[in-house]
């Protein structure tokens, strides 16, 4: 279940699962650091989590990693 995440949000989660930091994610996706932070905040809201570790655990629980 992806909780209606956008393709870009799923891409951010994939980058998180590879251990990338926000600056690396921005570079990988060709977006600004603030855009990555916005994506992360929206991901956290949709997944009902409060940080990247919880998001990664959610991904693991939902077989996305």
Give residue ranges: language-model regions.
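A general structural signal for well-ordered secondary-structure junctions
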Residues: 19-22, 65
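Hydrophobic patch in the ABC ATPase nucleotide-binding domain
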Residues: 5, 49, 64-65
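Short, basic, alpha-helical segments at the C-terminal edge of helix-turn-helix-like DNA-binding modules
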Residues: 52-63
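Regulatory hinge/linker segments at domain boundaries
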Residues: 1-14
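Conserved N-terminal glycine/acidic-rich loop preference
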Residues: 12, 35, 64-65
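Short helix-to-turn junction characteristic of helix-turn-helix DNA-binding domains
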Residues: 13-20, 59
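Recognition helix of helix-turn-helix DNA-binding domains
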Residues: 21-54
């Amino acid at each position: 279940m992806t909780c209606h995440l956008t393709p870009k949000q799923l891409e951010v989660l994939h980058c998180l699962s590879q251990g990338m930091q926000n600056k690396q994610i921005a570079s990988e996706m060709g977006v600004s650091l603030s855009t990555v932070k916005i994506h992360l905040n929206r991901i956290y809201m949709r997944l009902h989590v409060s940080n990247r570790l919880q998001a990664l655990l959610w991904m693991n629980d939902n077989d996305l990693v």
